Amino acid sequence: RDYRRSGMSLSEEDREKLKTIQKKLGTLTIEFDTNIREDKTIVPIPLGDLEGVPQDVIDGIDVVDENYQVTLDYPTFGPILDYCSVAETRKNVRFAYSKRAGLENVEILERIIKLRDEASDLLGYATTADYETETKMSKNAATVAEFYEKLRPVVRKKAEKDWAELLAAKREDLGDPTADFYPYDFSYYYEKIKNDKYAVDSQKVQEYLPLQNVMDGLFEITQNL
């Protein structure tokens, strides 16, 4: 199997093609990740529209022309989605986050998909999914699809229950029995339910788990593995 996957069974010409494809894939994957990591999108948010966001987060955001200059790094983006009570702010920030490096990366993603298909075809696999799953427990794409079909009704039942709870929380919060639920509402009402129902405040928990302490703890654990 490894012999086949590495392309050793191919002709010399096809092995060279495979090497070229793999090199391009490596370069494109790095470029894709770099574009997201280095995205400099700024979302202008009017003063007063970060209500509910922890003050230490707000204090770290620049202000220009009566607007907060919200960046999309997680330490800023995360708390806004979790705690900002202004729906329009959550909507704008989440939408911008989902589009990070979109113009550059859509083209790169299309090229990656095409190259992966070419590599799978060259190696004799029916699909890229079959190539990717061959070394996994599932062994092939058909097994994965079958598993998902069996899992779907089980997961759906729990998801519908969670969805109903989140929707009810939003409608109660707004006093609007007809309010709809949107993707940018999820984190906010999930945190609200945790706080209201289970008295779990993620911000309070973080006070006892500062990043450096967590990193030091993880380092100590890995040293003993």
What function would you assign to each model-found segment?
Residues V63-R100, F186, E191:
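Active-site-adjacent "gating/activation" loops or surface patches in catalytic cores
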Residues Y3-R4, G78-I80, S98-G102, T133-V144, ...:
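Second-shell loop/turn segments in exported
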Residues G7-L18, K99-K114, E118-Y131:
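A conserved hydrophobic secondary-structure block that centers on an alpha-helix together
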Residues K24-T27, T34, E38-L72, L115, ...:
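Active-site-proximal, well-structured secondary-structure segments within enzyme catalytic domains
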Residues Y3-R4, V93-A96, Y198-V200:
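Short, charged/polar, low-complexity loop and linker segments
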Residues R1-I36:
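Extended, charged alpha-helical coiled-coil/arm scaffolds that mediate oligomerization and mechanical coupling
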Residues R1, T71, E107-R111:
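Short acidic alpha-helix initiation/capping motifs at coil-to-helix transition points
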